[in-house]
Amino acid sequence: MNTKTFIKKYTMVIALGVVFILFAVLTQGRLLYPQNLSNLLLQNAYVLVMACGMLLCILTGGNIDLSVGSTVCLVGAIAAQLLANTGLHPVFVILICLLLSIVIGIWQGFWIGNVHIPPFICTLAGMFLFRGLGRAILGSKTVSIANKTFLNIFASYINVPGLDDQVKWSAFIVGIVISALLIANTFRARAQKAKKGYKQSAAASEFAKIAVIDALILFYTWKLAHYKGIPVMALWVVAVCLIYAFITSKTAFGRYFYAVGGNEKATKLSGINTEKVYFMAYTSMSLLAGLSGLLMAARIGSVNGDTGNSFEMDAIGSCFIGGASAYGGSGTVPGIIVGAILLGVINQGMSIIGLDNNWQYVVKGAVLLVAVIFDVVSNKKTGKAG
C-alpha cells in the first residue's frame, strides 16, 4: 500500500489523531484526564448507538431519519413516568419502551417502504409528532428518575470486589484481554487466508495497525482504571456496534442495504424485496433511538421536553464524517465509530477550553461540510456521483 492509498483509506483516522493531539495541547492535557476520557464515552454513547441505525438508512440511498431525537424524548418520557408513577419493575419498563420504539419504527417503515412516502417528509412529520407526544406525557415538566435498579442497568460502573479499590484493575485486565484477542484473531485470519491461497496485505503493515489499536485500547482502559472503571453503558455500546458490524459485513441481508443504495432498480430486478429493506432500516433505527432514550435518561437522571434535541444531527454527522456516502451504498460501522469519536473529541475539547456555544455549532458544521465535500469530490473522481 503506497502513501497516497494509505492516506485515502485512513483519512478520518488520521484526522481523529490530529484533532485529539490538537485538543490535548489546547486543553493543556486536561482532555487526557481519566474523568474526561470516561465522559467522552458516556456523553457520546447515544451517538454511537444511533449512528449504527442511521447508517442503514443512509446506505439505502443517502436517506436519513429526522425523528430519532424526538423518539429519544418520547421513550425517555414514558420510561420516566412509568418509573415514577407505577410499581412496574424497571425491566418491564425497559421492555415496554423498546417495544414502543419498534412500533414507532414499524409505523415509519410502513409509510416509507410500502407507501413510498419520501423518508425526509415522513421522518420530519415524526419529528414533530413524537416530540409533541413526549412533551404532553411530561406535562411540560422535568421528571426525575430515582430508581436505582434502572440506573444500575444503564449508568453504573463495573467493579469486582477484592480486585478493584482505588485503582479499578478489572478495567485494565479487560483491555489486556481484548488486545490479546485482537492479536490472536489477526494470526488466525492470516493463517486461513494463506491456507486458501488468498492474497493478503504485508504482515508488517497489518501487525503495525494492530499494535497501534492495542496501544490505544491499553491506554484508554488504563485511564478508566484510574477513574471509576468500565461504565456499564460501554457494554451496551459495544454490543450494538458488534451486532451491526456483523449484520452489515457478514450477512446477506446486511448487503441488501448496500445493494439498494448502489442501484435500487437493479436490486429489485434481482429479486430482493426493497420495500422490506427500507422497512427494516427504519424499524431498526427507531429501536436504537429508543435504546438511546433509555441510556440518556439514566445518565442524566431526568427527562424533559428538550431531551434529545439535535441528536439526529449528531448521528447523521457521525455517519458522514465516518465515511458513509451521501449517495448511499457505502459506509461501515468502524467508520461511523471513528466519526462519532471525532465529533465527541471536538465537542469535549471545545467545552474544556470554554469556547462559546455558538462557535461550537460553527465548528461542527464546518467539519461536517468538509467531510461531505470530500465524499462528493471522491465520488466524482470515481464516477459514482449523480
Where are these regions (language model features)?
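Membrane-helix/interface signature in polytopic inner-membrane proteins
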Residues: 186-200, 242-282
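Inter-helical junctions in multi-pass inner-membrane proteins, predominant
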Residues: 29-39, 221-234, 245-249, 254, ...
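Transmembrane alpha-helical segments in multi-pass inner-membrane proteins
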Residues: 282-295, 299-362
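Cytosolic-side transmembrane-helix boundaries in multi-pass membrane proteins
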Residues: 1-21, 142, 179-211, 273-276, ...
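Transmembrane helix-bundle core of multi-pass membrane transporters
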Residues: 130-248, 383-386
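Alpha-helical transmembrane segments within multi-pass membrane transporters and channels
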Residues: 87-128, 338, 343
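Loop-to-transmembrane alpha-helix initiation sites
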Residues: 43, 119, 148, 165-175, ...
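Single transmembrane alpha-helix segments in multi-pass membrane proteins
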Residues: 23-25, 30-86, 110-117, 266, ...
